[in-house]
Design a protein with these regions (language model features):
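Positively charged n-region of N-terminal signal peptides that target proteins for export
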Residues: 1-4
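Predominantly soluble domains enriched in secretory-pathway, periplasmic, or organellar proteins
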Residues: 8, 14-350
């Protein structure tokens, strides 16, 4: 004889199902459109833009909170007028929930959430400074003056103890001890130090020196330069793959992606993008690279199977299969896409 199923058991199962579906893992890609002052929220299952949200002018970079619920956007501004704000986006609700005024700090660019999910690091180029921002309080709680020109991108290593800031104008990396609150060292890496990524184990920092056509590998603890890797054609961003085997580098001039072997520290392949600029007028890089589609921002899926690259002069995001090293899809973006961030959550707005 079958035992009757208790009503409380049925209710518990129903509540569990409702809770589970309220945070469907459907993958959302946030793409910032610099010339439109918008953020596109793309559903990665369908490839469809689920929402287009306003930011302040010149959104350049985005960072995702550790739980995937919020994207933080740095509003860089225009050539004529520097920006001084951050935009906070709720991914599930697909809406802007807060604008953070940075006051005297101008041209916010590189940014990332710290592990606590409450604070974020933000570079302020105009002030040659790295900021610590309390996102909940919408306030700057600390500032580290790099004294370097064009402090552009930021990365952390050693469990979040140290921050590394790439300074384009000075060709250097500033190292900041976040626990002690001090600048530890300034490391000269090469002309145009810009893109920066940490190895998966957090022991190395990889820096693209765009004007020198090199990539520097720095020991995050000793701060010694371990290698200088040749990487031609204006290497502008870098991103380490989750398996720790490779580092992807977007090369703006040649409009392709260099794949570096993390162990041998050598370039092992190029992934052609087969795209051209749709136009070059009124864009950050203009016609500096001719008909290049100018690939910049790179995001890699946590499972390491896919990567997305924003082509800022072609108004498109390319999806790459990292097992075959081939392009598998093009995603529509707004005008001049660049910074991106990934969330495992699904936008709920229709």
């Amino acid at each position: 004889m079958k035992k009757p199923i208790h009503l409380t058991v049925l209710l518990a199962a129903l509540l569990l199902a409702v809770f589970a579906t309220s945070f469907v893992q459907a993958d959302t890609l946030v793409v910032l459109n610099k010339s439109e002052a918008t953020a596109s929220l793309i559903d990665l299952e369908s490839g469809r833009v689920r929402a287009t949200l306003p930011t302040d002018f010149g959104p350049h970079e985005a960072a995702m909170s550790p739980d995937g619920r919020f994207a933080l956007v740095g509003n860089y501004g225009s050539r004529e007028k520097p920006g001084s704000s951050l935009t906070l986006i709720n991914i599930l609700a697909a809406k802007v929930v807060k604008t953070i005024d940075l006051g005297e700090y101008q041209r916010p660019h590189g940014l990332l959430f710290l592990p606590d999910g409450r604070r974020a690091l933000v570079t302020a180029e105009e002030n040659r400074t790295l900021l610590v921002v309390d996102v909940e309080k919408a306030a700057v709680v600390n500032a580290f003056v790099t004294a370097q020109d064009v402090s552009h991108m930021v990365e952390v290593a050693l469990g979040g103890r140290r921050a590394f800031v790439a300074n384009i104008g000075s060709g250097s990396v500033s190292v900041i001890d976040l626990e002690k609150g001090i600048i530890v060292r300034t490391i000269e890496t090469g002309a145009g130090a810009e893109g920066i990524t940490a190895s998966v184990d957090g022991k190395e920092i990889w820096v693209t020196n765009r004007s020198a056509d090199t990539v520097s590998v720095i020991d995050a603890e000793s701060l010694a330069i371990l290698a200088q890797i040749s990487c031609a054609s204006f290497p502008i961003r870098a991103k380490a793959t989750p398996d720790g085997k490779h580092v992807l580098v977007s090369c703006a001039r040649s409009a392709d992606i260099a794949v570096l072997d993390a162990a041998t520290r050598k370039e092992v392949r190029r992934i052609p993008q087969d795209l051209r600029a749709v136009d070059t007028g009124d864009r950050l890089f203009g016609d500096q690279f001719g008909e290049s589609s100018v690939p910049i921002g790179i995001v890699i899926h946590p499972d390491g199977k896919k990567a997305w690259v924003a082509h800022t002069n072609a108004d498109v995001v390319v999806e790459i299969d990292l097992e075959t090293w081939k392009i598998v899809r093009l995603l529509e973006a707004g005008r001049e896409p660049d910074g991106m961030a990934y969330s495992a959550l699904e936008v709920k707005k229709d």
